Amino acid sequence: MQRVSGGYYDGRRFRRGTVGWEDGVIVETTSGLAREPLAKGLIIPPLWNAHTHLGDAVVTRELSGSIEELVAPPRGLKHRVLARARDQDVIRAMRRALVTALNAGTGGVIDFREGGIKGLKLVYRALLGLPTRAAVLGRPSGLTFNRREVSALLRACDGIGVSSYIDWPAGELRKLAAHAAQAGKSFATHCSERVREDIDAVLELKPTFLVHMIHATDSDLERCAEARVPVVICPRSNAFFGMTPDVPRLLRAGIEVWLGTDNAMISTPSLLREMEFAYRIARLRGGVPAMEILEMALRGRRFVDPKATTGIRVGNPADLVVFALPDGEHGFASLLRAVEADIALVVSGGIARRPPLPSEEPTGTKRLRPRRAQRTSR
């Protein structure tokens, strides 16, 4: 059996003790400290990045312009760059972004993948050999519903993730969402990022989650809470465009909030940076506890397993991150100031490694398969 010691997060607080695992499963959590643990410090499950656009990591220029000019389909900058970029350049850029996420303690991502079937192939090549889970939400190559194309997409990914309700002809989007539901796959969309959108029309699509909700009213948020639809916030991306999510208001409405990093061309996919920034911008509107920010960064796992806990428990997969930080009563605050260099050990499927992970593609990756998350039904 292998063990780590310090303060482990049980879903409510940090308990001083030891976590032990074997055969890829956590088999003990004890109050005593191991004599020779693999690492000591603050112990948490891996972070889950609930919203990324990894493909636009290929865009490296300094950016200026509005949301529409940079990211809106079909003529936003990222779409123009992706359309003419070499496949290998896109793959390398996505792989660098994934390694950045891994080295910041992330164990899984939910990626919105542009480019139809070809886009899916590229992200799966980028994932080859990396010790991460990825839930990939594809989208059609255009803003129209083509049953054959969508059926092929849904056979190859975990669902559909689109840019916005207002970007699509309403009838086409309803067909797209219905087809995903019929296939037993997820449907998700950005909502009220640029302007307020019709929340009733959006919720009629039965989304698994929504992203942003910057311009949502209190009534809109109440409707989301009633429908039990989580909202992913991406504060650094929003701030780039001169906006910030009202985190306390989202929580007061009773919404389950997840944390993501959004476009890789705007923000590095580091949830450590996102957590710190989310905590700071929440203070502008009254603040939220540091523990709540950590919870947001862990809840994205519920996309693939709705019953997943955010704490470390016996019987859970042996997926852990150990930070070389003091494990006392201020553990939550310490995590919100943590940087990549503070990570002492990462455990994935019971296999422990010391960071950082190199970004170079390993030899023989053509024979490897990406570790794609398999979502259970809600």
PLM feature segments, named:
Residues 1-33, 375:
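N-terminal metal-binding scaffold of metallo-dependent hydrolase/deaminase domains
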Residues 6, 24, 40, 51, ...:
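Divalent metal-coordination and catalytic microenvironments
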Residues 57-92, 131, 154, 195, ...:
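Active-site gating loops and adjacent loop-to-helix segments of metal-dependent hydrolytic enzymes
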Residues 82-157, 163-171:
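Active-site loop-helix segments enriched in His/Asp/Glu that coordinate
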Residues 143-146, 154-265:
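Active-site core of metal-dependent hydrolases
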Residues 204-205, 247-326, 338, 344:
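His/Asp/Glu-enriched, well-ordered alpha-helical/loop segment
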Residues 314-378:
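C-terminal cap of metal-dependent C-N hydrolases
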